[in-house]
């Protein structure tokens, strides 16, 4: 799981790219779970939380830019 300090150091473009990659990974993990091929079930939780952290950072930055 990514540290929040690592995420805050990234630019908006890097965060958007990471978000896309994580969503693809989440999609693949869902299919692996459905077919009982998932090796690390904890990875689903990690990916979900990292996506939430990135979205939170993007929202905070958008709110700060709007002020």
From Swiss-Prot:
SUPFAM superfamilies named among the record's database cross-references: Ribosomal protein L29 (L29p)
Source domain of life: Bacteria
UniProt keyword Ribonucleoprotein present: yes
Keywords: Ribonucleoprotein, Ribosomal protein
GO terms under biological process: translation
Name of one Pfam family that matches: Ribosomal_L29
Single GO molecular function: structural constituent of ribosome
PROSITE patterns: RIBOSOMAL_L29
Entry keyword Protease: no
HAMAP family reported for this sequence: Ribosomal_uL29 (MF_00374)
NCBIfam families: L29
Protein name as annotated: Large ribosomal subunit protein uL29
